[in-house]
Amino acid sequence: MNTSLFNALGYFLEVMRPFVVDVLKKNFPGEPWEGVLYAKLSYDKQRMWNISADNLATSGGDTKNLIDFGNLVSFAISFKDQVIQEVGGKQEANRFISYLQELQAARNKCQHYQELSSTEVEMAFGSMKMIAIMLELEDLKNEIERIQREENAP
């Protein structure tokens, strides 16, 4: 398992969760963001959401933690018009979705202890940095680069 990539993906997700919440709150004022996102999830993702929500309610955790990589992809596809506003155009939104799909695949491999090729690792780091650039999140880009440098340090 690539520990640096796993750490970078975790950090990336922590930054993206508030982004999703902010976009939903901005575009659907007066509606709970959880309900807006939940309504767009597939049946299977809704089932997983419910299980996670029950566990979260027991532990008193933050509902933002219900957002995972699978939900990021669903969010970007289901709320593409809103994503277009955030990233500046339809082509950029399509790239944003592709980057998230790439990251979801890398995250799944990391989570299931499957080996990633050096190319897959580079693509995952690149996808995180490209999303950070698209969203003008300089701190995210810098942190991903720092984690990546640690990976390549002797």
Predicted feature descriptions by range:
Residues 1-154:
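Amphipathic alpha-helical interface elements
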